[in-house]
Amino acid sequence: MGSGAGELGRAERLPVLFLFLLSLFCPALCEQIRYRIPEEMPKGSVVGNLATDLGFSVQELPTRKLRVSSEKPYFTVSAESGELLVSSRLDREEICGKKPACALEFEAVAENPLNFYHVNVEIEDINDHTPKFTQNSFELQISESAQPGTRFILEVAEDADIGLNSLQKYKLSLNPSFSLIIKEKQDGSKYPELALEKTLDREQQSYHRLVLTALDGGHPPLSGTTELRIQVTDANDNPPVFNRDVYRVSLRENVPPGTTVLQVSATDQDEGINSEITYSFYRTGQIFSLNSKSGEITTQKKLDFEETKEYSMVVEGRDGGGLVAQCTVEINIQDENDNSPEVTFHSLLEMILENAVPGTLIALIKIHDQDSGENGEVNCQLQGEVPFKIISSSKNSYKLVTDGTLDREQTPEYNVTITATDRGKPPLSSSISVILHIRDVNDNAPVFHQASYLVSVPENNPPGASIAQVCASDLDLGLNGQVSYSIMASDLEPLALASYVSMSAQSGVVFAQRAFDYEQLRTFELTLQARDQGSPALSANVSLRVLVGDRNDNAPRVLYPALGPDGSALFDMVPRAAEPGYLVTKVVAVDADSGHNAWLSYHVLQASEPGLFSLGLRTGEVRTARALGDRDAARQRLLVAVRDGGQPPLSATATLHLVFADSLQEVLPDITDRPVPSDPQAELQFYLVVALALISVLFLLAVILAVALRLRRSSSPAAWSCFQPGLCVKSGPVVPPNYSQGTLPYSYNLCVAHTGKTEFNFLKCSEQLSSGQDILCGDSSGALFPLCNSSESTSHPELQAPPNTDWRFSQAQRPGTSGSQNGDDTGTWPNNQFDTEMLQAMILASASEAADGSSTLGGGAGTMGLSARYGPQFTLQHVPDYRQNVYIPGSNATLTNAAGKRDGKAPAGGNGNKKKSGKKEKK
């Protein structure tokens, strides 16, 4: 394979047949990629295109995530091109030392699917080291008696390179007395020896300087030098001689320090001091020590086979005359099973998807034992019962894969322990543990803690208050288990849902957006959803039923008698001869609440004459408790309170004005001075009534003038007979007999009352009529009628107000019993406001009914004009027919024509009230 991008550099090309057979017997080796590169390549240099050599396209690189798994980061893979690049310094001598072959082996890891490939990069040596001597100069003593041909061992140079780039030869500077001889050891290394060419004469030259040069075989060759200083000494004829040139011994690596390795021995044939031999290492050793007298070599430190398998030392023997002899000591270290196997994980997936299929690759396992032979052969096993297994991939390489289904909710993590045991005696083992976390997938939907929820909320709750909280749990983790809440549906209007309730998406709290009213909304149901944040998201629904509880938030409302603008009711008449237990009237009230909050009770708060009347606690009936006494006032006042049964109770009050009288005329003088409250909102109505009254007066004056002129032209005395006493022709209601009758011309005074309360005014006759015979002004109250304001009546003597039908009870203004009808059918009674558009029609209807006696005021005998549906459930037999006291000037035909002319409508008949009632029912 080539080293350039796109092809494998200098890889061994095996025959096709051999590759086929090799793939059958050893599939793991088929995935091994080989490269050959020189050492000391610059960082970023391209070794080869690993992606192309593995069969990956450029488009696959982002998903396959090709990378290098190695203990030391010598190489890296380009994410864009898939090229294998140099990432750190490649020093062959540092990586492999003196080994003849140097290769770096590592794994290339690819994902999706996860797999790994063996890569072998052979490092070639370059001539980057020069030969070096340990000393820049050294001294050598040679006796002048030394014979020509005597050899002296010189210092050896070192070259870290191997092969041709290593040390190849030595050279010596020219000197006629010396020559250089190069010898080779058994391991192929060369060392120099200095040979004496002729006898030295100390007296002529006692000191010689030579230069020794060491050269390697590179191109160009590199060299190193040292200075050789030779001192000529006096004669010492015999040098020491070792009994062996090379000493060899084997030593176990576990021997303790101080163990004797061997003993070297040398002899010298001289005598005296020249025969005394001193032993020393040619180079200072740190592992072994040498006894200078005995030549015994002992261990100084603990030996380690894995660090150095053999030692080679040079021992010198020097006699007293300075002659030196050398021998070589070679110590071979024998391996012991003293290293446990080492287990390391590569490309470990710490997070495993819980839906991973069996056989998914989890990690690569590397086993390394520094021992050799059987001591370095390792067996790997997986401890415990876990859903994983290990598969042997190649020598000392294994795969950790899944061997079953995973469920994070049951077991979120696994503690995987792998034990490696060698085959030594005794065997050594080591274990490594790793925690594998299971990554969650969204396989669990949220689950509510209850199948359904039911809450009760009292009405009038503050807006924004929490009314309920639902909770759902999800067994998943992270976003898969993060639950958010929402309102999916309800039985409320979709557009109005947001104005009623809202829900916190995080806490599941349901908030009320408004104050609930029990009288409007008593219950509603929501469909809530809990949804996780997984992809795809899972959800669950639950129903929440909200019951709105009633509170006593509605005070009783008095329907009958209705309250006036001043908060009091108009008066009722009681016969003077009423016996105890006589039903005077009935207070009718309703309460919009329910239950005890709507259970009404009636109480007398204040009475002008205590003990004269009694009030039914539950019925509200006002009855006479005793007969009217002489000292009792004719006018009585009762302040009635209506309370409900709530806690605390709410109440409403009504004031009853009761008048003891047998006829209406008896109480007229008392009520004439009754002040009429003003209503600022009726100013516009007042002006309309005044304008209408002026038009009516002008019309009536024209009619009267026409009648007077006609009578004056007539010669018949009978035409003036109506002005005689006791003879008066009347049209419409009958005037009471105590009215003055005569043939005098009529005189009219206009009673103008405030339009807000007295829209219907009656005319008052001339001064011949007594004060007790004053005509009443109409009131819309439906009970008795207050008199007109005297100041107003005198200020407009020329005006006459038209008749009004508002003094009659309408269908919606008649009171009913408590609880007899709903709130929609019970309007305020009486209604003091009138519709200006129907004013003329009401006047005509009133005039017609007054003329023919069909007014609803007398619709039933003794019922005060109340219908059977809405009237109080009692009769007032004692109340006189006060319609005979109401006098409306003008004939029915005249009023009808006038009304029709004004309105452009047909004349109104006596059934005008029925039409009005029918119109309301149609609404």
Curated annotation (Swiss-Prot):
Q: Where is the Cadherin domain?
A: 31-133, 134-242, 243-343, 344-448, 449-558, 566-671
Subcellular location(s) per record = Cell membrane
Q: Which GO terms describe its biological process?
A: cell adhesion; homophilic cell adhesion via plasma membrane adhesion molecules; nervous system development
Compositional bias of kind Polar residues? 807-832
Topology term for the membrane = Single-pass type I membrane protein
What are the alphabetically sorted keywords of the record? Answer: Calcium, Cell adhesion, Cell membrane, Glycoprotein, Membrane, Repeat, Signal, Transmembrane, Transmembrane helix
- Where is carbohydrate linked to this protein? N415, N541
Sample GO molecular function, one term: calcium ion binding
Q: Which residues lie on this side of the membrane: Extracellular?
A: 31-687
Q: Give residue spans, biased composition: Basic residues.
A: 913-923
For whether the record's keyword set contains Chaperone, the answer is no
- Its signal peptide is 1-30
> Mostly located where?
membrane
Record-annotated membrane-spanning stretches: 688-708
Q: Which residues lie on this side of the membrane: Cytoplasmic?
A: 709-923
- Residue ranges of the region described as Disordered: 794-832, 893-923
Q: Which PANTHER family does UniProt cross-reference here?
A: CADHERIN-87A, PROTOCADHERIN GAMMA-B3-RELATED
Q: What does this protein do?
A: Potential calcium-dependent cell-adhesion protein. May be involved in the establishment and maintenance of specific neuronal connections in the brain.
Instruction: Specify the protein name.
Output: Protocadherin gamma-B5
Q: Please name the source species.
A: Homo sapiens
